[in-house]
Amino acid sequence: GITTAVWAGIMENPIKEAIMKGAAFAKENECDFIIALGGGAVLDSSIAIAAMATNEGDLWDYVCGGTGKGKPLAQKGLPIVTIATTAGTGSEINCWGVISNLETKEKIGFGNPTLTPVLAIVDPELMLTVPAKYTAYQGFDALFHHTEVMMSNGVNVLSETIALSAIANIAKYLPRAVANGNDLEAREHIAYGSTMAGITMQLTSTTAQHSMEHA
């Protein structure tokens, strides 16, 4: 069998201190890989924890923006398996996470292509209990990711094709998912739209409003 160790120290808008604690936990338990079960905060955190579980120093040593030192990762991070329980961020399939540093008062994206999850499980049945308000918030998050991609200077034929499909799905099915959280068909289409955002953001980029939203 597989020995497991559970760490549940992630909060909304994850902070650097939590990341370092999670990485220390992974080291102490000699984890071979990470399973990230949750919404955007958990999925974002798994990226940074996976990196710091195999690299020395502080997370901000490897952050490229702000006061980060921008050092390259010396070691490849732990493999990540993601299980999404919300539909909004698309973090289950991309290699970036947004982490806050309370000491420097910064909130910055951290990532590396080598930290892309090796497997993503996107099951809309896990999203049936998300309240209507948060279903709406998360659905608009996914929608705006795709609209940013369409406005980006880096948009290309592949990212445009995926983004337009996702926008159509979200526009059609988000009202249904908000009205009836048990509508599995609607949940499935919103999950599709969210996950595709993880792809389009990797293929293109977001715009300045993305950073403004995080701020």
Please describe what each predicted stretch is.
Residues 214-215:
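Catalytic phosphate/nucleotide-handling subdomain of diverse soluble enzymes
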Residues 10-11, 37-39, 204-209:
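Active-site nucleophile and cofactor-binding loops and adjacent substrate-binding regions
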